[in-house]
Amino acid sequence: MSEKKKVLVAMSGGVDSSAAAALLVQQGYQCDGAMLKLAPNEDSRCCSADDAEDARQAATRLGMRFYVFNETARFRRCVMDKFVAEYGAGRTPNPCIDCNRELKFGALLDRALTLGYDYIATGHYARVDLDETTGKYRLLRGAERRKDQSYVLYQLTQRQLAHLLLPVGDYDKPAIRDKARQAGLDNADKGDSQDICFVPDGDYVGFLRREGLPLTPGDFVDRDGRVLGRHKGLPCYTAGQRKGLGVAAGKHVYVLSKNGVDNTILLGDDAELYASSLLASHVNWISGETPAQPVRCAAKTRYSQTEAPCTAYPLPDGGLRVVFDQPQRAITPGQAVVLYDGDVVLGGGTIEKSE
């Protein structure tokens, strides 16, 4: 490129973001690295002192400057507090989506543009391109379906996509580790992060209890309102759960839904977990334009789910109704529904309820 474009690479200390930086340096971009200090304690698996040192070493190896930006207050307000509140209301949130919106593609992008960078880059397995026909930026799945992370990026806007590079999206994980080794990065074989970063042991209930969320016991009920037993608190259960209910119903029963108003949990048969449609709020259309007509597409309601054929109906209030060709199991309020047209992410929203 005739004039080097400046890129601020979001670095976590892991191999994906480090390899992203290496790829961009090789492509001729002028890169610097940045880590967002998010979690308020060292027990977190995110942005720990060890992770920061791994990121700093990778940046140094690549000839990049490295910064740490403290965003703990915003992370607490926009991600952790919301996580607790959503569980308290009987919903099941996805904090990674909130973190991407508010921190990685919110706070970090704002800082980067203020500091004179042209782009930010992350190690997400997804792709961005420009549709020459429409002049709109598009978000696409990562080339490797098993690692694709486009589900957690559906809230990206045209402004953000115009300043975003996703260099690892064209590769699979083994290739990315090879790229890191070729660049001489010490974290090439570092393990992948698991679970929610601020709940490193996976004990969500313990975290919520430490955060002061009351775990108020209540009733398990069936559709006729009959009490089947007592539960230990709404956050202890999730839609589709069968084990650990402690209910002697004479047959297998599953969590169908949680009611935060009267603190009850509805139980029923596996067949009752299936629903043909859902309503979603806080909808984002990546094109920036709400479709005037229903859209034939495919949708997924969980990160690891295979998308299912459906029709998406934009609603006058800005919401979204999704009607599936075949009923879907355990559609969960608080999770995201994300719409796809082939490899292209159309957008999505937060599930309010199934129908």
List each language-model region with its residue ranges.
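AMP-forming adenylation/ATP pyrophosphatase catalytic core
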Residues: 40, 121-355
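ATP-dependent adenylation/nucleotidyltransferase module used to activate substrates
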Residues: 1-154, 165, 174, 255
